[in-house]
Amino acid sequence: MIPAGTQASVAPATPRNVPNRGGEPNPSAAALAAIFGDRIVRSWVNCGETNVVVKVEAIHDVIQWLHEDHGQRYEYLVDVTAVEYRDAGRPLEVVWHLRSLSFLRFLRLKVELSARGPLMVPSVMDIYSGADWLERECWDMFGIKFEGHPDLRRILLWESYREGFPLRKDFPLRGRFSRAEQLKQALAADPEARYSMEELT
């Protein structure tokens, strides 16, 4: 739940090796630190855009507050995506891009997940209905599960695809079977039986 009247004693620090390349920080970052305290890991400005890393257990509450608070009003979910780095020591990131049309602000939120742990974050479909296909694409390409999503299934690949998740760094660069075999599997998947004609067109 969103705490009432809590304040952070120390502002989140800029992470090492991330340049602060000018631009004023989005005031929402300071507001988040004041409201959510140590559940905000850190924040920084890069190329004029404010980035905020949030603990995974708080991300739904943070996004809900940004959407509903009259001083924030982030009405538009621009994108949900993920990033996996070549450095095995770096966590996999789930990224939400939010925009406030009322206050002309942009905010990038991130959650860090260990590639060796469960890749799961809460769905925000109950806040933004437009998150539906964005979350499904993250599941399809990265294997990130969005807890609470009512229909989490593949959206770009066929449902019976078993080769893994194509945007992960451990995805094989060479297929284990021919393009003809892939086509055969795709045709056998019978997408019309699982998807509406509206989705297919």
What is the role of each PLM region?
Residues 1-201:
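Terminal low-complexity/charged segments
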